[in-house]
Structures are given as C-alpha cells and as structure tokens.
C-alpha cells in the first residue's frame, strides 16, 4: 500500500521536473528567435525608407508648415480636395449626376474617385458666418458681384490667412490695435460696428463716450467685418452683441491649404495691397465665366497647377479656428 503511494508521488515529481525542463527549453528557443529577429531589424533599418504612422507630429509655430511624407507619394493620391461653390451653380447645371461627372474628370488628372468633395453655400454672406474647411486642399469659388466687393475681399482675407484671436469684453474695457497685423473680426447675422477713439485722458476724440450716436460707424448690418483702426490709440466700441461676436485678432501668416477663385467680373479682387500680406499671395485667382459647366471644366483642367501653389495642412478646421488657434 505504501509502495503504491510512494510510486504515485515519485511519478508526480518526475512529471513536474520534466514539464519545467520543457518550459525552460521553449523559453530559450523563443528568446533566441526574438533576439535574432530584432537583430535583423536593427541591421536593416538604415536601409528602409517607409512611413511611420505612429508618430504624433507636434504642431508648433505656423500651422501651415508642411510635414514631408518620407514615402513621397504623389500629393493627389493621398489627399482630399474640397470644392466650395454657390448653390446657383447646381441650379443652372440642373443635372443630378453632375458631381459624378466631375469626379470622373478629376480622376483623369490623378485625383481618385472619393478624394473630391463638393460643398455648396447659399451666398457670400452666409458662407462668411460659418466657413468650414475640412479637406487637405480647399478651393473656394466666389462669383463676382459688384455690390459685394467688400464682402468678397474680407472673406478672402479671412480664408487665405491664419488668425490668432481672443474674446473682447467691450462693456468693460477699451481696446487698441498694436500694429497693422492686429484687426478686430466680427461675425454674426447682423454686425453694426461703431468706434470712438480716445485721447490720453480717455476722452473721446470727436465723439462722446457716453453717447453712442456720436461714435463713428465703420460697418452696418454686415455678416463679416474686419475692422482696422488707427494703431496705438484706445477705442471704445459699440457692437450689436446680440447678433454679432467680435474678436481681437492677430494675422499670423498665410493659410496655405486654401485658394480663392474669383468667377467672372471686370474687376479683379486683390488683397495683396494689405502690407500684412507677405509674401504676395498666389492663391487668389480669376477665371472667366459664361456658364458654370465651363467654370468647372477650367478648374478640372488646372487643378494640379492650383494645388502646386498651396501647402497641405496638418489638420482640419472650422470657423472656430478663426477665433481660437489651438
């Protein structure tokens, strides 16, 4: 009886020892394989040139700085392009498949189907209130209207440049613009802006700080206003804050993933006269207009030349980015 128990215990111990030996052998074999594999990777890594998708690139300085992809594929094979156009274009074309047609035409220029996005807007005024530019490259078509030249110029200035903005509390504080790059940008359904310049004693210059009727009116019932006043002078402001938001903004530099294309018009809009626009922008262009099909054909034909004057952004943005640069 005791012999059977001893045999059972001995068998169990031998089994444990054998299992331990097998596990240690497997561990040594796996270590050998892993270390050999890592050694091969270390030896070959200087000769490999591939994209590392695991790196989160830091955004410092200008957000328009392009990061070069080490694999250097053609830009249109890995990018998205947004085309913004007035709704009247789709109304005139009157073809349910016109976007598919254009997508196939863009494909002949190297842009794969699915990389082109079409976004319509009602008019310049409504687009300026909530511009959303989400693609790697954004082309904004603006049909020329002699009555909206100022709105078009201000919208182009807003889209083609990057702004760092902060809120303004006009009920408590006076504000001044420090230099030419410092502007006050207002957006809303109806923006009426009045200003009263102040002297060193905070008394109004040509106006009474207690009477807004004596303030100089610089904008009336507009949806987008970029206000420029005399630098280095304090101002008291009066703004229709119930329908408008005003921000204190600094122009940082070009927003290089956006191009504005003026459609038609005898006069050519130009924002390069602004001394803060440096270098002179090449991303504001004009095409002739007869029919919208002709306009889109022209865009397709020259899309790659247009993109060459632009730089791909590192992330998307919406109208909030014009107020807060994060």
From Swiss-Prot:
UniProt keyword annotation of Transferase present: no
Chain residues that bind Ca(2+) 2: 177, 228-229, 231, 301
Disulfide cysteine pairs (residue numbers): 82-135, 165-249, 191-244, 196-207
InterPro entries: VP7, VP7_1, VP7_2
Keyword annotations: Calcium, Capsid protein, Disulfide bond, Glycoprotein, Host endoplasmic reticulum, Host-virus interaction, Metal-binding, Outer capsid protein, Signal, T=13 icosahedral capsid protein, Virion
Processing and modification events after translation: N-glycosylated. The N-terminus is blocked possibly by pyroglutamic acid.
GO cellular component, one term: viral outer capsid
Region (GPR motif): 253-255
Binding site for Ca(2+) 1: 95, 206, 214, 216
Location within or outside the cell: Virion; Host endoplasmic reticulum lumen
GO molecular function, one term: metal ion binding
Signal peptide start and end residues: 1-50
Glycosylation site list: 69, 238
Pfam families assigned to the protein according to its UniProt record, in alphabetical order: VP7
Residue numbers spanned by region CNP motif: 165-167
Family: Belongs to the rotavirus VP7 family.
Subunit structure: Homotrimer; disulfide-linked. 2 Ca(2+) ions bound at each subunit interface in the trimer hold the trimer together. Interacts with the intermediate capsid protein VP6. Interacts with the outer capsid protein VP5*.
Miscellaneous section: Some rotavirus strains are neuraminidase-sensitive and require sialic acid to attach to the cell surface. Some rotavirus strains are integrin-dependent. Some rotavirus strains depend on ganglioside for their entry into the host cell. Hsp70 also seems to be involved in the entry of some strains.
Job description of the protein: Calcium-binding protein that interacts with rotavirus cell receptors once the initial attachment by VP4 has been achieved. Rotavirus attachment and entry into the host cell probably involves multiple sequential contacts between the outer capsid proteins VP4 and VP7, and the cell receptors. Following entry into the host cell, low intracellular or intravesicular Ca(2+) concentration probably causes the calcium-stabilized VP7 trimers to dissociate from the virion. This step is probably necessary for the membrane-disrupting entry step and the release of VP4, which is locked onto the virion by VP7.
Protein name: Outer capsid glycoprotein VP7
Organism for this UniProt entry: Rotavirus A (strain RVA/Human/Japan/AU-1/1982/G3P3[9]) (RV-A)
């Amino acid at each position: 009886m005791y012999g059977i128990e001893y045999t059972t215990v001995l068998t169990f111990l031998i089994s444990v020892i054998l299992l331990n030996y097998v596990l240690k052998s497997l561990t040594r074999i796996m270590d050998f394989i892993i270390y050999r594999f890592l050694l091969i990777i270390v030896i070959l890594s200087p000769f490999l040139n591939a994209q590392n998708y695991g790196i989160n690139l830091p955004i410092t300085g200008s957000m328009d700085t392009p990061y070069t992809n080490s694999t250097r594929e053609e830009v249109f094979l890995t990018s998205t392009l947004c085309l913004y156009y007035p709704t009247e274009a789709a109304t005139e074309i009157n073809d349910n498949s016109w976007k598919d047609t254009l997508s196939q035409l863009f494909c002949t220029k190297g842009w794969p189907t699915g990389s082109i996005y079409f976004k319509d807007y009602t008019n310049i005024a409504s687009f300026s209130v909530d511009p959303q530019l989400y693609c790697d490259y954004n082309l904004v078509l603006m049909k020329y209207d002699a009555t909206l030249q100022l709105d078009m110029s201000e919208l182009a200035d807003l889209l083609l440049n990057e702004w760092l903005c902060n809120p303004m509390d006009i009920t408590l504080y006076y504000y001044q613009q420090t230099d030419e790059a410092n502007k006050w940008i207002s957006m809303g359904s109806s923006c009426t802006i009045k200003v009263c310049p102040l002297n060193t004693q905070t008394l109004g210059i040509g106006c009474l700080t207690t009477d807004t009727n004596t303030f100089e009116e610089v904008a009336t019932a507009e949806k987008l206003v970029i206000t420029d006043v005399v630098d280095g002078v304090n101002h008291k402001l009066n703004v229709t804050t119930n329908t408008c938001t005003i921000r204190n903004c600094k122009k940082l530099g070009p927003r290089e993933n956006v191009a504005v294309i003026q459609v038609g018009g005898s006069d050519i809009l130009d924002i390069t006269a602004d001394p803060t626009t440096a270098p002179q922008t090449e991303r504001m262009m004009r095409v002739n207009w007869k029919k919208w099909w002709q306009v889109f054909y022209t865009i397709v034909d020259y899309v790659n030349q247009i993109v060459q004057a632009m730089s791909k952004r590192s992330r998307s943005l919406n109208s909030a980015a014009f107020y807060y640069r994060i």
